[in-house]
C-alpha cells in the first residue's frame, strides 16, 4: 500500500474492494445531519464515501502516521479527528444518537465490542467489519457450539444482523481469516429485563468458564439444585444450551 505500511500491532488490514465498500455504505445509509463516528479510518476506504454523505465526520485513530494524513486531507470543519485508543475512548463525549462504523482491528474486536456495549444509551446503531468467527459467535443461537458469553451479553443488549461476507482478497494485505459485516441496534430499555447487567455478565462468565461441564458443576457456588428446579432450568444442561432469557432469569434470581 503506497505511503503507509500496515502495522501488525494495530491489526491493520486495509479494505480495497470497491464493491464491498459500496455495500457497507449502502447498509449504513448515512444522512447529512447525522453524527457518524468511524473507528479506525485507516487509509480512508470507508471514510471518503462517508464524507460524501455527511456534513461532518468523527474519526477515532491511534496510528500517528494516519492521524497526520487525515488532518492534512480534511479540514476541522468537515472532520474531527479523535487521537487515541478506541478501547479507552469515551464515546459519550461526542454526543448522542451516534452511528458507529468501522473495519475494527481484529486483535481487539472482542474487548472493543464489550467496551462499546457500555455506551448503548448514546448509540443509534453500529456497523462493523469483523472476523467472521467473531460474528458467528455474536449471532449464535443456544445449542450451537459458538454460543457463549459474547452471544449472551450482546444479544441481550442489541438486535444483531449479519449483513455481508467479505473474503480475504478484499483487503491489502489479505488477512488469514474470513471477515463479515454485522449491524448492531441497541434494544429499547423496555426489553432489558435484567435487574443488574453486571450480575448477568458475572453469571455468563461463570457458566462459560468450563463450557463442557454441566451447569450444576460450573454454577455450584451460585445455585443449588433446588434453585434450578425453582427456575425451571435443567441443571444437567451445558452452558451453550441455555437461552439468553434463562440467563437473565438466573441473574435476576441472584440479584
UniProtKB/Swiss-Prot annotation:
Keyword match rRNA processing: yes
Keyword field: Cytoplasm, Methyltransferase, RNA-binding, rRNA processing, S-adenosyl-L-methionine, Transferase
Cell location: Cytoplasm
GO MF: 16S rRNA (adenine(1518)-N(6)/adenine(1519)-N(6))-dimethyltransferase activity; RNA binding
Residue sites binding S-adenosyl-L-methionine per the record: 13, 15, 40, 61, 85, 103
Catalyzed reactions per annotation: adenosine(1518)/adenosine(1519) in 16S rRNA + 4 S-adenosyl-L-methionine = N(6)-dimethyladenosine(1518)/N(6)-dimethyladenosine(1519) in 16S rRNA + 4 S-adenosyl-L-homocysteine + 4 H(+)
Family annotation (InterPro entries): KsgA/Erm (IPR001737), rRNA_Ade_diMease-like_C (IPR023165), rRNA_Ade_Mease_Trfase_CS (IPR020596), rRNA_Ade_methylase_Trfase_N (IPR020598), rRNA_adenine_dimethylase (IPR011530), SAM-dependent_MTases_sf (IPR029063)
SMART domains: rADc
GO cellular component: cytosol
Enzyme Commission number: 2.1.1.182
Superkingdom as given in the UniProt entry: Bacteria
One family name in Pfam for this protein: RrnaAD
Secreted keyword on record: no
Entry-linked HAMAP family: 16SrRNA_methyltr_A
Family the entry assigns: Belongs to the class I-like SAM-binding methyltransferase superfamily. rRNA adenine N(6)-methyltransferase family. RsmA subfamily.
Function: Specifically dimethylates two adjacent adenosines (A1518 and A1519) in the loop of a conserved hairpin near the 3'-end of 16S rRNA in the 30S particle. May play a critical role in biogenesis of 30S subunits.
The protein's name: Ribosomal RNA small subunit methyltransferase A
Amino acid at each position: 500500500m503506497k505511503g503507509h505500511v500496515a502495522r501488525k500491532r494495530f491489526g491493520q488490514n486495509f479494505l480495497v474492494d470497491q464493491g464491498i465498500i459500496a455495500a457497507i455504505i449502502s447498509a449504513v445509509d448515512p444522512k447529512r445531519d447525522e453524527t457518524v463516528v468511524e473507528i479506525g479510518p485507516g487509509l480512508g476506504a470507508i471514510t471518503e464515501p462517508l464524507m460524501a454523505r455527511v456534513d461532518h465526520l468523527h474519526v477515532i485513530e491511534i496510528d500517528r502516521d494516519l492521524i497526520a494524513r487525515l488532518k492534512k486531507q480534511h479540514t476541522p470543519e468537515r472532520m474531527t479527528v479523535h487521537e487515541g485508543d478506541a478501547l479507552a475512548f469515551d464515546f459519550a463525549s461526542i454526543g448522542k444518537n451516534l452511528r458507529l462504523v468501522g473495519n475494527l482491528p481484529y486483535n481487539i474486536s472482542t474487548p472493543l465490542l464489550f467496551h462499546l456495549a457500555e455506551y448503548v444509551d448514546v448509540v443509534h446503531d453500529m456497523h462493523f467489519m469483523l472476523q467472521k468467527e467473531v460474528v458467528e459467535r455474536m449471532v449464535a443461537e443456544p445449542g450451537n457450539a459458538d454460543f457463549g458469553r459474547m452471544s449472551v451479553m450482546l444479544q441481550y443488549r442489541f438486535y444483531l444482523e449479519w449483513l455481508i461476507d467479505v473474503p480475504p482478497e478484499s483487503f491489502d494485505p489479505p488477512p488469514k481469516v474470513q471477515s463479515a459485516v454485522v449491524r448492531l441496534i441497541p434494544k429499547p430499555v423496555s426489553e432489558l429485563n435484567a435487574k443488574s447487567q453486571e450480575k448477568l455478565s458475572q453469571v455468563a462468565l461463570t457458566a462459560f468458564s468450563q463450557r463442557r461441564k454441566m451447569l450444576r458443576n460450573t454454577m455450584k457456588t451460585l445455585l443449588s439444585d433446588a434453585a434450578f428446579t425453582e427456575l425451571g432450568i435443567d441443571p444437567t444442561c451445558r452452558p451453550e444450551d441455555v437461552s439468553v432469557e434463562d440467563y437473565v432469569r438466573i441473574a435476576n434470581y441472584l440479584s
